[in-house]
Amino acid sequence: MNQFYKRHFLRLLDFTPAEIIALLDLATELKKDKKSGCEQQKLVGKNIALIFEKDSTRTRCSFEVAAYDQGARVTYLGPGGSQIGHKESIKDTARVLGRMYDGIQYRGYGQRVVETLAEFAGVPVWNGLTNEFHPTQLLADLLTMREHLPNKSLNKMTLAYLGDTRNNMGNSLLEAAALVGMDLRLVAPKACWPEEAFVISCQALAQKTGGKITLTEDIAEGVNGADFLYTDVWVSMGEPKEVWQERITLLKPYQVNMRVLALTGNPQVKFLHCLPAFHDDQTTIGKQMAEQYDLPGGMEVTEEVFESAHSIVFDQAENRLHTIKAVMVATMSKI
């Protein structure tokens, strides 16, 4: 029986550094098998519930395709497709679905919801995203970084994350860096730094793994020598418009553009983004942002960077599939 069998995947700190590497190795193997057409199905006969309280493209598609590739079946429960938290408690929903399904994915709001599902379902529960953490995204990020710097181990890599570092991506990057011993720089105005107690706890773990976690407002200092630059959207569509103006004004200096890439001093620096990205005006929201806030070349990242050879965002997006598949296979297959 493998070490992950019947375990949950709720946040990265539930795992050891060696276990994170093992999941990445499994994802690499599964990706290779899929590309070569020799993938072995280990989840035949399994049924999976996908609970989405927030809309999704990459996460939903990754879970569905990964399940189909492995011979499993899925039921999609969208934002209006279940009674969870409305007419039925999370606890009761967990106990019902746990009787019918072999695994449950949850993408929604509070971390406490996915933790309650895990406590009462009796089957593996996976966190597809909460307000606090996005662990499946970080597995894909780490796999992508390994692929693009094959001669460097993760504990020798440097990543700078620019923008609003208080969100689920900032939190999960802190956990990932602490676990694998990476040099992580969070580059943002102090108003957008993560909770201090959480940062201190991750820094303490990083000291044990050989990692380094730095928070700075200085862009040049933060990106110097970085192997990877990472950013995410500055505003969420559920937030009031008043917040947009304040946030964009605050974060505009932290836009990832060619000047910032040059400040790394690394001509081979790569750009990461968990997507979707506001890099042009080809979407309704993107056009609105460009016109209203004078951002013709993109918001958190410019079109020039996004479409450049530095950008590996679509490799990163593809790797959501392979890493999510690894999590499902590891937690639902005995072998």
UniProtKB/Swiss-Prot annotation:
Function: Reversibly catalyzes the transfer of the carbamoyl group from carbamoyl phosphate (CP) to the N(epsilon) atom of ornithine (ORN) to produce L-citrulline.
The EC number(s) this enzyme carries: 2.1.3.3
GO cellular component, one term: cytoplasm
Family, as annotated: Belongs to the aspartate/ornithine carbamoyltransferase superfamily. OTCase family.
Protein name as it appears in the record: Ornithine carbamoyltransferase
Localisation per UniProt entry: Cytoplasm
Binding site for carbamoyl phosphate: S56, T57, R58, T59, Q83, R107, H134, P135, T136, Q137, C274, L275, R320
The organism's place on the tree of life at top rank: Bacteria
Origin organism lineage: Bacteria, Pseudomonadati, Pseudomonadota, Gammaproteobacteria, Enterobacterales
Organism: Yersinia pseudotuberculosis serotype O:1b (strain IP 31758)
GO biological process: arginine biosynthetic process via ornithine; citrulline biosynthetic process; L-arginine biosynthetic process
GO molecular function: amino acid binding; ornithine carbamoyltransferase activity
Binding site for L-ornithine: N168, D232, S236, M237
Keywords assigned by UniProt, alphabetized: Amino-acid biosynthesis, Arginine biosynthesis, Cytoplasm, Transferase
Signal peptide: none
Enzyme class: transferase
Pathway this chain belongs to: Amino-acid biosynthesis; L-arginine biosynthesis; L-arginine from L-ornithine and carbamoyl phosphate: step 1/3
